[in-house]
């Protein structure tokens, strides 16, 4: 078996049907299978899977209780036989060449992570629980508002003949804008970009199965919505794999009410990730989630950090930087942070030694961006001007 398409599903029967229908249209000479983990759905997903007429080996497993996306994906992974894993969610519509291009991309590439295009969107159904922004956008696109829940907005013929691609649109958010600007600067090969795992989004990505198995699959400790793909991407990056964006490998997300129950999910996931990667060799994680710096400066800081990591004599600077990013995290995710005792104070660190060491590192290694960032954090969070050690 050349490839296994991994799909977790939860109460998405109608969108999953469309997704499987798009996979039925694949123009691929290689053998591939599709594995669906029904993650405790209550909408008849299992009966749909049992009756679906697939043109490929379709394997599905029923999980009685939803234990998170990571758990569901792992259940599917344990049944996978393919050399290549293609991650493709239940709400995604695959272009006809998606599977073939993912497989082809890994030819003669042992250590590659392929990140397909992930910002295409389409309205295949109307949902009464849509957020207002969805309803406003849908009204602009269609000229009128559908009247009943789960009203079909996309015909099967559109999926079979591929015309759904012409009806799709780009997701327009600050997050996507940031990622597009990163691609403009560093290219689709992401050379020189130190956080390529940010592009590993498991609705359209692939990697050889052996790497995921070696890393212990997805982290089932992540039970709230999101971040399990980031976590695996971080570990793939730390294992030395190369990341590459492929704009020509296209899948389209079928819009639906958000699975994120509240901002608390995001806060909890950030806290979990920062605790898990609480070391100076994972500062990219803390900068990505908590860093108060612009994206271009953030990457330059990471380039400086790579230089500093080459010698243990600068670990004091990096540990201080890490601890201060934890303080930024607590400010960002804890609404009551002002009422609590500070995590650290100026007395928590040997700032006299830091004051002497930082200019030396700056002069020897040219780590100007890191130095400026550390000066700024110490000033803002510890109320100390590190250049003079005068209390502000």
Swiss-Prot record:
Keyword Transferase in record: yes
SUPFAM superfamilies attached to this UniProt entry: Nucleotide-diphospho-sugar transferases (SSF53448)
Coiled coil, from the record: none
Keyword Cell membrane part of the UniProt annotation: no
UniProt keywords, alphabetically: Glycosyltransferase, Transferase
EC code(s) of this entry: 2.4.-.-
Protein family (similarity comment): Belongs to the glycosyltransferase 2 family.
Protein name: Uncharacterized glycosyltransferase YfnE
Gene this protein is translated from: yfnE
């Amino acid at each position: 078996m050349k490839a296994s398409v991994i799909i977790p599903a939860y109460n998405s029967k109608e969108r999953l049907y469309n997704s499987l229908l798009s996979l039925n249209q694949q123009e691929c000479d290689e053998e591939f299978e599709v594995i669906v983990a029904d993650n405790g759905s209550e909408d008849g997903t299992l009966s749909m899977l049992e009756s679906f007429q697939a043109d490929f080996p379709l394997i599905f497993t029923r999980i009685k209780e939803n234990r998170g996306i990571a758990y569901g994906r792992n259940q599917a992974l344990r049944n996978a036989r393919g050399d290549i894993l293609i991650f493709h969610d239940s709400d995604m519509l695959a272009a006809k060449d998606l599977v073939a291009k993912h497989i082809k991309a890994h030819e003669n590439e042992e250590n590659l992570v392929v990140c397909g295009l992930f910002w295409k969107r389409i309205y295949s159904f109307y949902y009464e629980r849509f957020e207002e922004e969805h309803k406003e956008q849908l009204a602009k696109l269609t000229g009128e508002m559908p009247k009943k829940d789960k009203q079909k907005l996309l015909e099967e013929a559109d999926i079979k003949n591929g015309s759904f691609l012409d009806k799709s649109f780009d997701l327009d958010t600050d997050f996507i804008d940031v990622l597009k600007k990163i691609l403009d600067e560093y290219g689709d090969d992401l050379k020189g970009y130190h956080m390529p795992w940010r592009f590993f989004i498991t609705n359209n990505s692939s990697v050889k199965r052996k790497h995921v198995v070696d890393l212990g699959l997805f982290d089932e400790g992540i039970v709230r919505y999101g971040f399990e793909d980031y976590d695996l991407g971080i570990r793939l990056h730390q294992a030395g794999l190369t990341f590459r964006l492929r704009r020509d490998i296209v899948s389209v997300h079928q819009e639906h009410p958000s699975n994120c129950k509240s901002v608390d999910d995001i806060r909890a996931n950030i806290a979990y990730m920062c605790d898990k990667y609480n070391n100076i060799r994972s500062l990219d994680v803390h900068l990505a989630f908590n860093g108060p710096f612009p994206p271009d400066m953030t990457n330059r800081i990471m380039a400086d950090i790579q230089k500093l990591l080459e010698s243990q004599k600068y670990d004091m600077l990096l540990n201080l930087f890490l601890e201060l990013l934890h303080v930024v995290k607590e400010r960002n995710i804890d609404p009551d942070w002002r009422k609590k005792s500070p995590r650290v104070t100026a007395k928590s660190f040997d700032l006299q030694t830091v004051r002497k060491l930082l200019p030396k590192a700056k002069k020897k290694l040219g780590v100007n961006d890191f130095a400026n960032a550390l000066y700024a954090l110490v000033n803002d969070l510890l109320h100390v001007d590190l250049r003079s050690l005068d209390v502000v």
